[in-house]
């Protein structure tokens, strides 16, 4: 198997080989011989005395070419003038020695050998074609059995296996009427005599006639392989090799080490084994050796060739002298160190260097400091050129000398060369495109690169010893691209969310915050100033302080009708610091943006506003000035930390005493048996959690205020100037949670498994921890450190998979013209609007007109890009939902269109053609991956578990509405008890817009009615957070069934209290098999002792107790509707094992089926229950036409529907995690997209990471890019095969044009790994994972790679079809088409 020779430099010397696609196939023996320059007959490599290659050996100069340039081996012909002569003495052609890198040899095998990839790469292709099992084929190949190749007139079957004894018996019986062979010859004979076309016909007929699914799948697979062979014109017997190609010797070198030893490539060993065994076999055949010996030798030859191709795939791996498995040809290309990932995708480049980075606070945003020494080395060729040009040096050698001596002129020339020549800085790991940015170098002394502080966030760099790499763009085009696209000052916005990434942090924030804070009664309060200059003078002469409140006249610039700036003078009440800051504001940015204490969030908003109002250039200048100012005032402010800044609240002792008393009370209740151990633990944890919060609140209240005397002599509170508080409040460093640990109490700690230790750490760091407290704390903290190490690798792998699945998605056209899209609403969770509608639709293109709900007039027409102005207008008009275009519904075939994608987040305008939106999406999702948690539950070292919620309150005034799934009954006390599983109370405002949505659990008590007007803060429902009740919907007298103590229920007596309760035992733990199936249930009787039935049916009421339930009713007890039958204790304070963080994101993108998946209704209809089987319940849904759909559900699962309930298709009927494949099948693409986007966003939102929905949608598009053919119609597809969506669309269009029947297909969801591997490009798939399998499959299919994606083009070394490369590829394409048309025309004229 060989990638067909792309580059043969000898044939195409001086001419660039142009190609548009790469085809892979199986090489025929003739092809292999045609590549070869001669047969390798001997296993020898080089002569040990002369070090010259042996003739006919593995390094033979006659076959592979001369060892030295233009010199034959015996030395008869030397020098260029004999070029092309073949020496008659040694037979070597006189030419360049580098031909030894490309000339191949071959080995003529004495017996055919099966190619291991087609045999052992699962599913076995040989097995598939021959319809034999792998085990059978192996028995034949490795000489354990005969296979009948031609049964002749005997009753034997073709492909039947015979043992040796059988074979000889049959020979006696039938003579030579039949043919049976052993080894690869037998298999080759079978392959050769297989009639491919006939077999395809038979299979197609079978496919139509068969009914079983498994059979259809099996036939379809086999059909696909045979059709591929038929189509590509490759012969089946080529999978068995007669000739083995030999790799050119310089690709498997033999290097002499000192001391007369040699370092050699493992391939030489493997080849030698093959040649040795092959030669031995030839000799044995000539001698007519006994069969058994020949057979053994053939088997050994087969094994040697197996090892050469893929060592270790079958049997034990061949090892070298040092017991290490030898590296075979397959190992050369696969894995991280293989050809693809190491050499083709991970090339190293010249003109680069690396050094440690330090701060460059005086730099401008587009500059970086480059050490002179580095610059001299990096720009050497440029300097040589200039030195020669100026006549300072006559030759390169002389120039080199001057540079080495570092004469003064060299430095002047270096300055010239470097002027306006951008360089690129990169910090590993490069997680997103901002990890490489271009800067203009400024020469500096010293040896460290100086980096602008504001770009640190993008590089994720700090100055604790980080290193960065420098690269020099050489060509003019490269320099231009670096300057226009990559210059740091052109990358102000983050491509992940469109917000500024050039945002001041730490010292700068602290300085700006300190500068813009106001003080009460500072020196000179209430002064009036005519302009800022006057403020400056007053400040410098110490007449006023930085925080003094003053009134000042400020000149602002406002745009007039013509769009030009005009000065407007306003009076402002402000502070000295803010007035000084107003000087650096760009034109057009109103003063009110800085007329407040600037915290980190405010500064971010300020820069964002500046970008939107004043444009890129002014923003960059403004950011730089902010930085200089911030650093200046941070230095002048002299803010530092002292132990006294950590003020411990006076109330702490009292609060601790109170909590201890409560805990003691709970312990007492537990001793008296009023609460279980689990409840006691939960309550204790809750008490300590609350105590910690109270202390933290007291501490923050104490820290954040300080008493001062105002101008009138009264004592007033003002915001504190405590250093620690200022650092946290400004967002420069630290958070309330950390201050709480410094001067409040450390609080509850978690064990590594996530459970909370019930004794909290009551001290803080200022008081110091006792040994025990310290020990408790270390437990969780170490887990955190171990986690971080794992997290990085996992996050990197997720990014790699994401990039791989989206790498070929590029914007290729402006508008695909579709009117499809998704409807966007605000995301409401609990009482909060988590993401407003305006944020979700900003930068999208509308798919249909947006209409004002009150007046009915069109606000925005379809096909409009929604800018900030438009979304604000939509927001004010009270529109609830907007239909926008999305990448998922884009109709463009290979790529996306600009309108479906919308705004390029990093540039703030509609995306350009050629933007690699796929990779950007992958990076935006992958880059914050390291910030996500690895744990399943998110608890830091300090347990940040909110006390369990036990009620919901309204956050705003409005009307309460119950959701459609709401079900409740009224109990004897008149309370409304919820008995539905997915119930929600929704609150609408006066216009009827949804403002809040609250989930209400099963068993909650509702305190409001449907349609009732409510006030903010009103409680809507309450419930017990620690147990889950089991509630009856019917009244009657209790009658138990299967309630046998010790069999189905156990009496649990608490050791401490001596009280006993009945608890249901898990069926799996029961002793006898009969009792495993018994379920304790409760029936209800009326006053006459007759079983009560479900109203409207004849089915008696029967409720089964789930495992672990604590039963709270007695036999014969009268109960009413809504009463509790049993309580199921919730797992103790481990928050329910929710997969969170990184694993959750990976799970969603891999589209994994969850373990205990819930079930969705397959059809719309009415629910009823059928006859139960052992351990399963039968649920039936009958639709309107009376068609019933049955499903069996395990009794352990919770069914969320009841008899007679009407369910809609796609509604949840069994509790559990949702399976995304079900959502796609039953609810469609939009519902699926909404589910994945929301779930992924939830994980990131928890960590405070903002990512645009767009990026997730781009990935979903790639997960949905293949479809399953349900009915092939007349399109030539096979029913049941998976194909690219674009291919089906194209085939269907063609079929409809020709009046044929189009194919029907269903959408399928592929996980990202699967989707990457199933891409059309085999080069991209092979370089991702499972290289062997991908290449084997591609070779059999005779696949052609059209080189559409980015990865394939990088691998073959062309410009990528994205960005500036897209235009290059397009123009080349047009040229080709022009050439083709011309040739066609000339042919016509010739004829």
UniProtKB/Swiss-Prot annotation:
Highest taxon, organism lineage: Bacteria
Positions of Zn(2+) 1 binding: 72, 74, 87, 90
SMART domains: RPOLA_N (SM00663)
A single MF term (Gene Ontology): zinc ion binding
Pfam families associated with the record: RNA_pol_Rpb1_1, RNA_pol_Rpb1_2, RNA_pol_Rpb1_3, RNA_pol_Rpb1_4, RNA_pol_Rpb1_5
Reactions catalysed, as given in the entry: RNA(n) + a ribonucleoside 5'-triphosphate = RNA(n+1) + diphosphate
Enzyme class: transferase
GO cellular component, one term: DNA-directed RNA polymerase complex
Residues engaged in binding Zn(2+) 2: 816, 890, 897, 900
Gene3D superfamilies: 1.10.132.30, 1.10.150.390, 1.10.1790.20, 1.10.40.90, 2.40.40.20, 2.40.50.100, RNA polymerase II, clamp domain, RNA polymerase Rpb1, domain 3
Cofactor, how bound (note): Binds 1 Mg(2+) ion per subunit. Binds 2 Zn(2+) ions per subunit.
Binding residue positions for Mg(2+): 462, 464, 466
Keywords, comma-separated and alphabetical: DNA-directed RNA polymerase, Magnesium, Metal-binding, Nucleotidyltransferase, Transcription, Transferase, Zinc
UniProt record, GO biological process: DNA-templated transcription
EC number(s) per entry: 2.7.7.6
Known cofactor(s): Mg(2+); Zn(2+)
PANTHER family (UniProt xref): DNA-DIRECTED RNA POLYMERASE, DNA-DIRECTED RNA POLYMERASE SUBUNIT BETA
Primary role: DNA-dependent RNA polymerase catalyzes the transcription of DNA into RNA using the four ribonucleoside triphosphates as substrates.
Homology family: Belongs to the RNA polymerase beta' chain family.
Quaternary state and interactors: The RNAP catalytic core consists of 2 alpha, 1 beta, 1 beta' and 1 omega subunit. When a sigma factor is associated with the core the holoenzyme is formed, which can initiate transcription.
Name recorded for this polypeptide: DNA-directed RNA polymerase subunit beta'
Annotated gene: rpoC
């Amino acid at each position: 198997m060989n990638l067909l020779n792309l580059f043969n430099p000898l044939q195409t010397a001086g001419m660039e080989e142009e190609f548009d696609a790469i085809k892979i196939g199986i090489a025929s023996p003739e092809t292999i011989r045609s590549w070869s320059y001669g047969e390798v007959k001997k296993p020898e490599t080089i002569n040990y005395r002369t070090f010259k290659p042996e003739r006919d050996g593995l390094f033979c100069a006659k076959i592979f070419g001369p060892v030295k340039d233009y010199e034959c081996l015996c030395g008869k012909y030397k020098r260029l003038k004999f070029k092309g002569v073949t020496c008659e003495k040694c037979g070597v052609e006189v030419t360049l020695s580098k031909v030894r890198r490309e000339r191949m040899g071959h080995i003529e095998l004495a017996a055919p050998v099966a190619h291991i990839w087609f045999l052992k790469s699962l599913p076995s292709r040989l097995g598939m074609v021959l319809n034999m099992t792998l085990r059978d084929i192996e028995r034949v190949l490795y000489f354990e059995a005969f296979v009948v190749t031609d049964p002749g007139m005997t009753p034997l079957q073709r492909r039947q296996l015979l043992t040796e004894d059988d074979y000889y018996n049959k020979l006696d019986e039938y003579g030579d009427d039949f043919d049976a062979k052993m080894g690869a010859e037998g298999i080759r004979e079978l392959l050769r005599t297989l009639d491919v076309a006939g077999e395809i016909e038979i299979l197609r007929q079978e496919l139509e006639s068969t009914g079983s699914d498994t059979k259809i799948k099996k036939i379809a697979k086999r059909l696909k392989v045979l059709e591929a062979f038929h189509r590509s014109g490759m012969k089946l017997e080529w999978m068995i090799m007669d000739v083995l190609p030999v790799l050119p010797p310089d690709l498997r070198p033999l290097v002499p080490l000192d001391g007369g030893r040699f370092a050699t490539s493992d391939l030489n060993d493997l080849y030698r084994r093959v040649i040795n065994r092959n030669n031995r076999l030839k000799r044995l055949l000539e001698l007519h050796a006994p069969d058994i010996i020949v057979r053994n030798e053939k088997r050994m030859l087969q094994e040697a060739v197996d090892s050469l191709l893929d060592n270790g795939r079958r049997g034990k791996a061949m090892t070298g002298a040092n017991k290490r498995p030898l590296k075979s040809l397959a190992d050369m290309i696969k894995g991280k160190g293989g050809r693809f990932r190491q050499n083709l995708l991970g090339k190293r480049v010249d003109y680069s260097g690396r050094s440690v980075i330090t701060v460059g606070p005086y730099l401008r945003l587009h500059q970086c400091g480059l050490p002179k020494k580095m610059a001299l080395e990096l720009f050497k060729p440029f300097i040589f050129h200039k030195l020669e040009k100026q006549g300072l040096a006559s030759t390169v050698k002389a120039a080199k000398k001057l540079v080495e001596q570092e004469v003064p002129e060299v430095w002047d020339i270096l300055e010239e060369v470097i002027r306006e020549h951008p360089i690129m800085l990169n910090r590993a790991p490069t997680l997103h495109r901002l990890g490489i940015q271009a800067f203009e170098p400024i020469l500096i002394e010293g040896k460290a690169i100086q980096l602008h502080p504001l770009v640190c966030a993008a590089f994720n760099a700090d100055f604790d010893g980080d290193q960065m790499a420098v690269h020099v763009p050489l060509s003019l085009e490269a320099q231009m691209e670096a300057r226009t696209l990559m210059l740091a000052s052109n990358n102000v916005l983050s491509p992940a969310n469109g917000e500024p990434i050039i945002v001041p942090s730490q010292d700068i924030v602290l300085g700006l915050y300190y500068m813009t804070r106001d003080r009460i009664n500072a020196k000179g309060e209430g002064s009036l100033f005519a302009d800022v200059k006057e403020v400056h003078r007053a400040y410098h002469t110490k007449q006023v302080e930085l925080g003094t409140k003053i009134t000042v006249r400020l000149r602002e610039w406002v745009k007039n009708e013509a769009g030009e700036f005009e000065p407007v003078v306003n009076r402002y009440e402000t502070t000295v610091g803010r007035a000084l800051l107003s000087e650096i504001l760009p034109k057009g940015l109103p003063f009110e943006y800085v007329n407040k204490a600037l915290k980190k969030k405010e500064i971010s908003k300020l820069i964002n506003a500046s970008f939107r109002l004043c444009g890129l250039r002014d923003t960059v200048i403004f950011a730089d000035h902010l930085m200089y100012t911030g650093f200046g005032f941070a230095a002048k402010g002299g803010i530092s930390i002292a132990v006294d800044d950590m003020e411990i609240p006076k109330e702490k002792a009292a609060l601790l005493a109170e909590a201890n008393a409560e805990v003691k009370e709970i312990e007492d209740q537990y001793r008296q048996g009023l609460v279980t151990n689990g409840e006691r633990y939960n309550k204790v944890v809750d008490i300590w959690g609350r105590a910690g919060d109270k202390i933290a609140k007291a501490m923050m209240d104490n820290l954040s205020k300080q008493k001062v005397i105002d101008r009138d002599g009264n004592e007033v509170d003002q915001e504190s100037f405590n250093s620690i508080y200022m650092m946290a409040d400004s967002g420069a460093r630290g958070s309330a949670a950390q201050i709480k640990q410094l001067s409040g109490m450390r609080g509850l700690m978690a064990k590594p498994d996530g459970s909370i230790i019930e004794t909290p750490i009551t001290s803080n760091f200022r008081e110091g921890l006792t040994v025990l407290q310290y020990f408790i704390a270390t437990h969780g903290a170490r887990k955190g450190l171990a986690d971080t190490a794992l997290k990085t690798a996992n996050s990197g792998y997720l990014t790699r998979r994401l990039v791989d699945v989206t790498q070929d998605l590029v914007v290729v056209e402006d508008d695909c013209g579709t009117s499809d899209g998704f409807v966007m609403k605000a995301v409401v969770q609990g009482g909060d609007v988590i993401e407003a509608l305006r944020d979700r639709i900003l930068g999208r293109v509308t798919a249909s007109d947006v209409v004002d709900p009150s007046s009915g007039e069109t606000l925005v027409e379809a096909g409009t890009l929604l800018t900030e102005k438009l979304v604000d207008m939509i927001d004010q008009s009270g529109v609830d939902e907007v239909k926008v275009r999305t990448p998922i519904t884009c109709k463009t075939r290979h790529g996306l269109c600009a309108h479906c994608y919308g705004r390029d987040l990093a540039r703030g305008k509609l995306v350009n053609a050629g933007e690699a939106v796929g990779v950007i999406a992958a990076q935006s999702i992958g880059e914050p991956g390291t910030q996500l948690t690895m744990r399943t539950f998110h608890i830091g070292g300090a347990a940040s578990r909110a006390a369990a919620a036990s009620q919901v309150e309204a956050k705003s005034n409005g009307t309460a509405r119950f959701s459609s799934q709401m079900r409740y009954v009224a109990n004897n006390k008149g309370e409304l008890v919820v008995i539905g599983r997915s119930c929600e109370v929704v609150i609408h405002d006066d216009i009827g817009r949804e403002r809040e949505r609250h989930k209400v659990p099963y068993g909650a008590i509702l305190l409001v009615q449907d349609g009732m007007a409510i006030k903010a803060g009103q409680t809507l429902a309450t419930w017990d957070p620690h147990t889950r009740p089991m509630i009856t919907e019917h009244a009657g007298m209790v009658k138990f069934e299967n309630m046998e103590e010790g069999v189905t229920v156990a009496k649990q007596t608490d050791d401490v209290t001596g009280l006993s309760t009945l608890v249901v035992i898990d069926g799996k733990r029961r002793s006898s098999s009969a009792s495993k199936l018994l379920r304790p249930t409760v029936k209800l009787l009326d006053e006459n002792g007759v079983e009560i039935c479900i109203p409207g049916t004849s089915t008696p009421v029967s409720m089964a107790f789930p495992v672990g339930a604590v039963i709270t009713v007695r036999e014969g007890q009268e109960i009413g509707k809504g009463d509790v039958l049993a309580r199921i204790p919730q797992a103790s304070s481990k928050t329910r094992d929710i997969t969170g963080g990184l694993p959750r994101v990976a799970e969603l993108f891999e589209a994994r089926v969850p373990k205990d998946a819930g079930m969705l209704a397959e059809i719309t209809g009415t629910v009823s229950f059928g006859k139960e089987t052992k351990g399963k319940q039968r649920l039936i849904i009958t639709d309107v036409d009376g068609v019933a759909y049955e499903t069996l559900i395990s009794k352990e699962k919770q069914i969320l529907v009841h008899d007679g309930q009407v369910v809609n298709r796609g509604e949840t009927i069994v509790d559990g995690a949702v399976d995304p494949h079900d959502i796609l099948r039953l609810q469609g693409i939009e519902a699926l997209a909404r589910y994945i986007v929301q779930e992924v966003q939830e994980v990131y939102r928890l960590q405070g990471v903002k990512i645009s929905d767009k990026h997730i949608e781009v990935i979903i598009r790639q997960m949905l890019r293949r479809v399953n053919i349900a009915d092939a119609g007349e399109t030539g597809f096979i029913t049941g095969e998976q194909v690219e969506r674009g291919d089906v669309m194209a085939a269907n269009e063609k079929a409809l044009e020709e009046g044929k029947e189009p194919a029907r297909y269903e959408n399928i969801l592929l996980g990202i790994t699967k989707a990457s591997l199933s891409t059309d490009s085999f080069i991209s798939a092979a370089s991702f994972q499972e290289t062997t399998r991908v290449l084997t499959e591609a070779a059999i299919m005779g696949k052609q790679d059209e080189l559409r994606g980015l990865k394939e083009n990088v691998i073959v070394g062309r410009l990528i079809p994205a960005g500036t490369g897209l235009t290059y590829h397009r123009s080349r394409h047009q040229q080709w088409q022009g050439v083709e048309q011309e040739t066609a025309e000339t042919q016509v004229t010739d004829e």
